[in-house]
C-alpha cells in the first residue's frame, strides 16, 4: 500500500534506502533463520520466553511471552532501525509509534531472560554471526508495550 500510495517504483534505486539495490530487492530481503542459535541460548541461559516478531510487530507478539500483570518497556535507540523502516515511515506518512505495531523494526526475535544472562546470550548469538542487544525490560503492567 505504501509503495502504490507514494507512487514508488519497485525497479528504482532510492539512495535513502540503498546505494545499489532496487526497492523491490530491498523489500524481498529474506528473513534470517535463528533456530539453531536460539536453541543454544535456551540450553545455556534461563530463558523465560521467545517471541518471533512478525506481522503485528511488537504490540501483538511480545505480549505472548509475558505473564499476567507484566508489560514490556522498549528502549528505543538501543538498536539501529534499518533504512527500509525509516523510508516506509516517511513515504507512507505512518506515525512513528504505529510502525512498531505494524513492522518488526529490524528486531526479528525477542528472548526474555534475567538481565544476568543477557551478555551470555548476546555472545552466543554473536558467535553465530547475529547482532543482538538488550532492547528493553519487563515491567509491571497488563500486556502493556511502551
Please report, for each region that a protein language model flagged, where it lies by residue.
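Glycine-/charge-enriched secondary-structure boundary and capping motifs
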Residues: 9-146
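Mobile "lid/hinge" segments at catalytic clefts and subdomain interfaces of large enzymes
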Residues: 1-10
Amino acid at each position: 500500500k505504501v509503495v502504490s500510495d507514494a507512487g514508488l517504483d519497485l525497479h528504482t534505486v532510492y539512495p535513502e534506502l540503498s546505494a545499489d539495490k532496487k526497492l523491490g530487492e530491498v523489500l524481498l530481503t529474506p528473513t534470517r533463520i535463528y533456530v539453531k542459535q536460539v536453541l543454544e541460548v535456551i540450553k545455556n541461559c534461563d530463558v523465560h520466553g521467545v517471541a518471533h516478531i512478525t506481522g503485528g510487530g511488537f504490540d501483538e507478539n511480545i505480549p505472548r511471552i509475558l505473564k499476567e500483570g507484566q508489560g514490556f518497556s522498549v528502549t528505543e535507540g538501543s538498536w539501529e532501525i534499518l533504512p527500509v523502516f525509516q523510508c516506509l515511515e516517511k513515504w507512507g506518512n505512518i506515525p512513528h509509534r504505529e510502525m512498531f505495531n505494524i513492522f518488526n523494526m529490524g528486531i526479528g526475535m525477542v528472548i526474555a531472560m534475567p538481565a544476568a544472562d543477557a551478555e551470555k546470550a548476546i555472545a552466543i548469538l554473536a558467535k553465530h554471526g547475529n547482532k543482538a542487544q538488550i532492547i528493553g525490560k519487563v515491567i509491571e503492567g497488563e500486556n502493556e508495550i511502551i
